[in-house]
């Protein structure tokens, strides 16, 4: 058992009381009130300040300076080091989510002690048990299922509730403490892909190779003349000092570049920063790109020398020998390919909702302005045809020769600088099988039917076992963030299928209610760790996330609890190698200092709180070496070049078993798929439903913080043109529904969303009634579990619904 000191319920309530009173009395200015209290305490020299971090999944990490008195966090500040200039060692200022960390630590939803389910999964009925009882139950379940089904039956579920830590890190699965533990006892069923980037990661890999397509650093837009953002919204998704909003503002001011936003929703990255917003129907980006390409080809605005030297498949000259005649991109665009349709602006206007004249103007702007920074966020690809969309958008910088130069980009989202800080070793996984992260529910009910050709299984031809045990660490993806909640609920309620669900978390989330064993985890504030994967554009940094307070109640760090579990499984020495958590951190830090000699000593870093390093090579330019010398620095594609036509995809399209309306194509074409604009299902459900990331939360993290919920209420966005015939007024309670479920939520009537589309931010905590109607605005009641064709990823923006006033 751990020897960690605990905080009592009495102390916990004391620490929460000021925040609770504030939540009732003054929700509008909580941070100002707390600042006055902190100033008074500082004057009396009764506080100390300890460095910590916000380690949620917003795209980076942010330092927090915790004010502590009598083992209680009284106030949270952020980085106060460095400059205000983005390409120097600038201050990494946490957003209001990170600064509300105290409200996460002292939240009424905190898990306080180990618990065991006593009702049905999802009912949230548990009884308190001891740590020894909990770990014994887990050990027995692991032994029983491994003996009966093998290690392939043990699954590490996708979860990003704590990211970037060295010890406290929930994703990717192979880098977690649970992976290290499982590898000590024979391994586990892994997953590949992620809910953020499944389609683009696979799609652009076939274009650029290397497993993950790179982009120029966002700071490099100071060298550009034109910025075109397809669904890229850092002002909400990456809004902190560890994000990119401030960087964009400063870099754009230096370049004076025109910025065009292409998005169904007028997002906060616009908000007056943009020069033009072009609304587009969701899922039609590839049609727009095809029409832009048509104009650029017809008006000789493409970079033919670049296409000839660096690319495969643009025209007949570079088409692979195994491709059919007229199988190249130019033929597809001009209408002498297989479909025989010229991709004119008039053709695209009917699909995208963008007038043909504006398409022509945009094509000329992109084709005649160089360099141009063209990038896509991760929203456009999160669709049923998302792999094709991601590849299509990348065609714009390829056609115009903007790849590998300053001020240009690849069409991918921006990349950033990183430093070689050593990670915690997690040992080798003996299990070879890996499933698409989105198909874990299928792996429960039909695991042994899933194959490489039908379901994208990797490492083996076919799964040998269904999933019988799930580790769910810092994850709300078991229910809340996974699609089609009602189907998942039905699968998980049958505990003869998946026999054990173990959740390790800080709070009683929607997912936690489906657990068999609940283990209360320490927050970042209650343990020592390093926060890694921290960067913004051309600066990387590491945060010393020190232990700010003692663990609350019976909460324990994950390394501590797994060390005891390893002892019950007879592998403690292999798991710990005789080190405590702090001893591991000191060991890793000394290894990191060998790679980064400029790092201070451990104790100096502990006082300093943050280590920053600016890229000595200046702004990042993706594939610059390839552009400078393609023979010496080929891409990691079969041809070594940019593959507009992919022979690998042509082969997959022939051999994989696909649904009739699934499309895998060697070219980045526009293809309709399920629940798209123009689908016959629109007769019943005429509105497209799209999700977006909301500044009130990071996915579902911070979704239970009172002041953030009050400042940013959950609403569905609807255009006045759609609201008027339904007699819906701003603020009305409405029902959104389809065959998969129903949500009741207040409506925001706004011209900031294109007609024919409603938008609902993801991450709201699922709150069903007895009829399965959700009252929180959880979009995943309405999304589908049907995967995308190639990545087998989550198409959570491909939804058709109807909306009615209640």
Curated annotation (Swiss-Prot):
Predominant location category: membrane
Lineage of the species this protein comes from: Bacteria, Pseudomonadati, Pseudomonadota, Gammaproteobacteria, Pasteurellales
Organism: Haemophilus influenzae (strain ATCC 51907 / DSM 11121 / KW20 / Rd)
Compositionally biased intervals (Polar residues): 795-806
Keywords from the UniProt entry: 4Fe-4S, Cell membrane, Iron, Iron-sulfur, Membrane, Metal-binding, Molybdenum, Oxidoreductase, Signal
PROSITE patterns hit by this protein: 4FE4S_MOW_BIS_MGD (PS51669), MOLYBDOPTERIN_PROK_1 (PS00551), MOLYBDOPTERIN_PROK_2 (PS00490), MOLYBDOPTERIN_PROK_3 (PS00932), TAT (PS51318)
Enzyme Commission number(s): 1.8.5.3
Catalytic activity, reaction form: dimethyl sulfide + a menaquinone + H2O = dimethyl sulfoxide + a menaquinol
Subcellular location as annotated: Cell membrane
Protein name according to UniProt: Dimethyl sulfoxide reductase DmsA
Binding-site list for [4Fe-4S] cluster: 54, 58, 62, 95
GO molecular function: 4 iron, 4 sulfur cluster binding; dimethyl sulfoxide reductase activity; electron transfer activity; molybdenum ion binding; molybdopterin cofactor binding
Residue stretches making up the 4Fe-4S Mo/W bis-MGD-type domain: 47-109
CDD domains, alphabetized: MopB_CT_DmsA-EC, MopB_DmsA-EC
């Amino acid at each position: 058992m751990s020897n960690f000191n605990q905080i009592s319920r009495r102390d916990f309530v004391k620490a929460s009381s000021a925040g609770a009173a504030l939540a009732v009395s003054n929700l509008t200015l909580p941070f100002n009130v707390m600042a006055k209290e902190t100033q008074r305490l500082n004057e009396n020299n009764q506080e100390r300040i300890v460095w910590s971090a916000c380690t949620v999944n917003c795209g980076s990490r942010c330092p927090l300076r915790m004010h502590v008195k009598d083992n209680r966090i009284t106030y949270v500040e952020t980085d106060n080091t460095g400059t205000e200039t983005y390409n120097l060692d600038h201050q990494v200022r946490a957003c209001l989510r990170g600064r509300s960390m105290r409200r996460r630590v002292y939240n009424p939803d905190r898990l306080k002690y180990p618990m065991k389910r006593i009702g049905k999964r999802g009912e949230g009925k548990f009884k308190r048990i001891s740590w020894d009882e909990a770990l014994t139950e887990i050990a027995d379940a692991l032994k029983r299922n491994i003996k009966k089904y093998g290690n392939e039956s043990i699954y590490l579920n996708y979860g990003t509730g704590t990211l970037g830590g060295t010890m406290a890190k929930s994703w990717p699965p192979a880098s977690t403490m649970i992976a290290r533990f499982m590898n000590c006892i024979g391994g586990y069923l892994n997953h590949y892909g992620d809910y953020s980037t499944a389609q683009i990661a696979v799609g652009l890999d076939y274009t650029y190779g290397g497993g993950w397509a790179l982009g120029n650093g966002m700071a490099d837009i100071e060298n550009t003349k034109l910025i075109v953002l397809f669904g890229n919204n850092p002002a909400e998704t990456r809004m902190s000092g560890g994000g990119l909003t401030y960087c964009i503002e400063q870099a754009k001011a230096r370049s004076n570049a025109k910025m065009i936003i292409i998005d169904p929703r007028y997002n906060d990255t616009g908000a007056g920063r943009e020069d033009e917003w072009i609304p587009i129907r969701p899922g039609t980006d590839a049609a727009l790109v095809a029409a832009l390409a048509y104009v650029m080809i017809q008006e000789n605005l493409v970079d033919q020398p670049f296409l000839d030297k660096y690319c495969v498949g643009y025209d007949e000259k570079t088409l692979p020998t195994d491709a059919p005649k007229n199988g190249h991109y130019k033929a597809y665009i001009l209408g002498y390919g297989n479909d025989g349709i010229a991709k004119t602006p008039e053709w695209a206007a009917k699909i995208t909702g963008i007038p043909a004249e504006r398409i022509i103007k945009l094509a000329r702007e992109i084709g005649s302005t160089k360099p141009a920074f063209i990038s896509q966020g991760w929203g456009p690809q999160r669709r049923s045809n998302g792999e094709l969309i991601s590849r299509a958008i990348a065609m714009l910088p390829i056609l115009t020769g903007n790849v590998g130069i300053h001020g240009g980009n690849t069409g991918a989202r921006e990349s950033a600088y990183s430093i070689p800080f050593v990670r915690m070793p997690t040992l080798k996984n003996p299990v070879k099988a890996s499933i698409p992260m989105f198909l874990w529910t299928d792996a429960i009910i039909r695991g042994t039917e899933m194959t490489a050709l039908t379901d994208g299984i990797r490492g083996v031809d076919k799964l040998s076992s269904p999933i019988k045990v799930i580790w769910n660490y810092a994850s709300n993806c078991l229910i809340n963030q996974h699609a089609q909640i009602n189907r998942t609920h039905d699968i998980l309620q049958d505990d003869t299928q998946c026999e054990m669900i173990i959740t390790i978390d800080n709070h009683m989330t929607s997912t936690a209610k489906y657990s068999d064993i609940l283990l209360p985890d320490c927050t970042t504030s209650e343990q020592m760790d390093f926060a890694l994967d921290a960067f913004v554009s051309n600066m990387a940094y590491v945060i010393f996330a020190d232990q700010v307070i003692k663990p609350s109640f019976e909460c324990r760090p994950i390394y501590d609890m797994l060390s005891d579990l390893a002892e019950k499984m007879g592998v403690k020495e292999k798991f710990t190698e005789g080190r405590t958590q702090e001893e591991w951190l000191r060991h890793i830090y000394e290894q990191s200092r060998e790679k980064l000699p400029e790092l201070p000593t451990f104790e100096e870093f502990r006082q300093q709180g943050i280590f920053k390093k600016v890229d000595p090579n200046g702004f990042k330019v993706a594939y610059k070496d390839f552009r400078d010398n393609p023979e010496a620095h080929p891409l990691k594609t079969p041809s070594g070049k940019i593959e507009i036509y992919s022979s690998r995809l042509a082969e997959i399209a022939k051999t994989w078993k696909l649904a009739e309306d699934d499309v895998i194509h060697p070219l980045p074409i526009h293809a309709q798929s399920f629940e798209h604009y123009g689908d016959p299902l629109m007769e019943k459900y005429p509105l497209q439903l799209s999700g977006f990331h909301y500044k009130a939360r990071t996915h579902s993290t911070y979704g239970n913080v009172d002041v953030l919920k009050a400042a940013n209420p959950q609403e569905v966005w609807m255009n006045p043109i759609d609201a008027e015939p339904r007699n819906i007024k701003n603020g009305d309670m409405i029902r959104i529904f389809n065959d998969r479920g129903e949500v009741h939520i207040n409506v925001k009537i706004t011209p900031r969303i294109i007609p024919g589309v409603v938008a609902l931010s993801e991450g709201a905590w699922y709150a069903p009634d007895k009829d399965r109607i959700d009252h929180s605005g959880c979009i995943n009641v309405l999304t589908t579990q049907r995967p995308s064709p190639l990545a087998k990823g989550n198409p959570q923006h491909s939804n058709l619904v109807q909306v009615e006033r209640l």
